[in-house]
A protein has these predicted regions:
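Positions that flank functional sites
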Residues: 63, 125, 185
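Structural motif
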Residues: 123-131
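Soluble or luminal CAZymes and related metallo-dependent hydrolases
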Residues: 35-39, 76, 125, 216, ...
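Non-catalytic C-terminal accessory region of glycerolipid acyltransferases
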Residues: 130-246
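A generic structural signal for well-ordered alpha-helical segments
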Residues: 47-48, 110, 136, 170
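Short acidic-hydrophobic, aromatic-tinged amphipathic segments that line or gate anion-handling sites
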Residues: 57, 116-120, 209
Length: 246
């Protein structure tokens, strides 16, 4: 949290960017998806520079070249989605816990990419969001989903259990599933320190529909979970090349 406060105070002279983000988000008819996404990434770059944050991405070449897909990542903290967007050149959106999505800056980041807010305690609403994601992925949209449903504030690269229901949107869309392993992202805002921090994002080999069409959502969830856990372990051991191959 110290770094978050430091970033905010260090960018007070850019406070005008917050209402600007809100304006762009409210007028998608004027500002293209690409424009709004790049403005989000511009804000992320400013935050990284002030916050002394470096994010290295591996396996970017694994991302499908055409059409929509869903990235499923482990969840460590507030920086996770920003770390992915920082290295993901094509516009993508996010499905996020509604309760965490209205914090200052978080709201603006989510709105700019037309993110989906999911109520974890409302099954009917959650099912509706998954259906929306499915339809939009069919149209070529790309989404980030954190299938653990949330995160705990604790120091370490923990990978919390995944909720199989989170995979149903990708399954219905018959879309590629891209496992994403996030490493050391928790250090950005959970460490009470301003020392330079380096995080990693690993894009693993995607699972295409033909590979998982005969699998249940539970089995898909377990497989993605195991692959991400293996990648995180390799990364902690410093073997980044092996991590991408998981």
């Amino acid at each position: 949290m110290l770094r978050f406060i430091y970033v905010i105070l260090g960018n007070l002279h850019r406070i005008w960017m917050i209402p600007t983000m809100g304006y762009y988000a409210r007028h998608p008819e004027k500002y293209s998806e690409k424009f709004r996404y790049e403005y989000d990434r511009h804000c992320i770059t400013i935050m990284k520079k002030r916050g002394r944050i470096t994010t290295n991405a591996y396996g970017v070449g694994n991302l499908p070249k055409d059409g929509g897909y869903v990235m499923f990542a482990n969840h460590q903290g507030k920086y996770d989605a920003l770390g992915i967007m920082d290295s993901h050149n094509n516009p993508c959106s996010i499905v996020m816990d509604a309760d965490r999505s209205y914090m200052p800056l978080v709201k603006q980041f989510i709105d700019l990419v037309q993110g989906k807010r999911i109520k974890l305690d409302d099954l009917r609403q959650a099912a509706g969001i998954i259906s929306e994601v499915s339809e939009e992925v069919k149209q070529g949209w790309k989404f980030i989903i954190f299938p653990s449903g949330g995160y705990e504030h604790r120091n370490g690269n923990y990978v919390d259990p995944f909720k199989p229901g989170c995979f149903k949107g990708a399954i219905r869309a018959k879309a590629p599933i891209v496992p994403v392993a996030i490493v050391n992202s928790w250090k950005v805002f959970d460490l009470w320190s301003l020392r330079r921090v380096v995080t990693q994002v690993f894009y693993l080999k995607p699972m295409f529909y033909d590979e998982y069409k005969d699998m249940k959502s539970n089995a898909i969830s377990d497989l993605v979970y195991k692959r991400i856990c293996s990648a995180v372990r390799c990364a902690e051991e410093g073997d980044f090349k092996a991590a991408v191959l998981k």
